[in-house]
Amino acid sequence: RQMCIRDRFREAVIMKIIMLGAPGAGKGTQAKKIADRYNIPHISTGDIFRANIKNGTELGKKAKEYMDKGLLVPDELTLDLIMDRFKAEDCKNGYVLDGFPRTIPQAEALDEALTSAGEKIDYAINVEVPDENIVNRMSGRRACVSCGSTYHVVYAPTKVDGICDRCGKELILRDDDKPETVQNRLNVYHKQTQPLIDFYKNKGVLAEVDGTVDMEDVFNAIVKILG
């Protein structure tokens, strides 16, 4: 009978989703597509920081103090900002959280805060892409030295190799996209963030999708999971 009632109210089911995956796996793109499809907000920690700082909120002022010194915003403050964002009207049917948690302590703190509020995460979607693919994807990016336009040597090449289509200036490989930099970021990810996969698997909310296929195919696989 309980299942029957749940099915009847399927339309109103609240969907609280966390996106997992290595940097460059495409989780941000998929988060935006999920948000559009299910009419729930795509929430990233960067956006929350910027909005609170811009609006001069108490939490925003505290976060700005750390950021101005080039320090990481402490987990506790980040979590306060996130939980505050969840109270907004547009989150009443759920949200897609992207970029948090990144560590087990963050995941445990989020879990505790949600439980205290009588809430829980419904899905943790892991976009799986091997390191080799990510290094190739990211080290293929090129940026224009003048106008900042971005391209990719394989997926979005310019008409003339190494020259910006828009302004005709030279393209460069940014330091952030150099293979060794990308691999270093992936090493940090495997050490800090990979354990989250087991954390959410143990909670029975993990869903894994192959992120090596076409972007639309990745999204279709996610839609199948979410229903």
Which functions belong to the PLM regions below?
Residues 1-5:
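Short, small-residue-biased leader/transition segments that mark boundaries at the very start
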